[in-house]
């Protein structure tokens, strides 16, 4: 009886041990559609696709607060309906939306504004993905010396700088995060001037390494951040340097563009001279104003010599959306054209008057 008990106990122990080993093996997942991260960067082509090209998936969007432009309740709306440029009036029961649009125009948004939070999260998501991409490029560079590496590194740095431009433009002083591994407790706020200087320096250093190609034309550089795009961002930064370098908006001391100086191509220029310099660089690359302003907004506008950075909108190739056109059409106008309309956004009277609306100097484009 005792011998039987020992044998039975031993059998139970062996069975339990086998079950534990079997369960452990069973819980190890090996999905057929998964790829180990390190296998996504085995050569320079894979590195470009997964560390550089993948970031452009986020330039446009198809849902609220996603993409740099095209969708609702994101960067465009926060930059437009908070100014005298445009308004989203409440008509009947349309466009009240809990007072959201009125809050933007009247500057009465609160800390619980979902659109503002979602836009912040979108922008920082791409910043962190860019940080991760730069880390992957540096890791690859430890064992490879491909000639494309400096250009790929520069493209990601410039892309990250552009996202920081949108962040500081919307939010002022923000955290400057340059690693994907930084702990939340170590993230601190940086003054707006520091953010500005970082962006400006990144774009100055990366611009010479970027291809001097038209980003708005079909081909290998379509929709990418090329040298003209970097120059344009530098011009915009210098143009608004008085704002972006002001850390205290409530005092009576503000920077003056004539006394803000930059080291530009071996020269010392003030802010306004810097704007002129980078605009001249853009012109030298073949850009100019279109004789027909509307040509920039044609369906097939890839031949534009004025558009500098565009978001690809081909419906058969991309999911990016452009909602602003149908959002502004009156219902009846849209119906007459066989299109959709939402009777939404409108220009303000102040914006129209800037172009001489209903005066003898009225802009001929109103005709």
Question: What does each model-identified segment do?
Answer:
Residues 20-22:
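C-terminal motif of bacterial Sec signal peptides marking the signal peptidase cleavage site
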Residues 24-101, 174, 209, 224-367:
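An aromatic- and glycine-enriched ligand-binding surface/loop that stacks and positions planar moieties
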Residues 45-68, 89-171, 183-219:
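Conserved, well-structured interaction surfaces
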Residues 12-16:
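Hydrophobic helical h-region of N-terminal Sec-dependent signal peptides
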Residues 172, 178-180, 203, 241-243:
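Short, small-residue-rich loop/turn micro-motifs
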Residues 2, 151-154, 321:
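A general, composition-driven signal for non-globular sequence regions
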Residues 33-36, 178-184:
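Short linear capping/connector segments at secondary-structure termini
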Residues 2-11:
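Bacterial N-terminal signal peptides that target proteins for export
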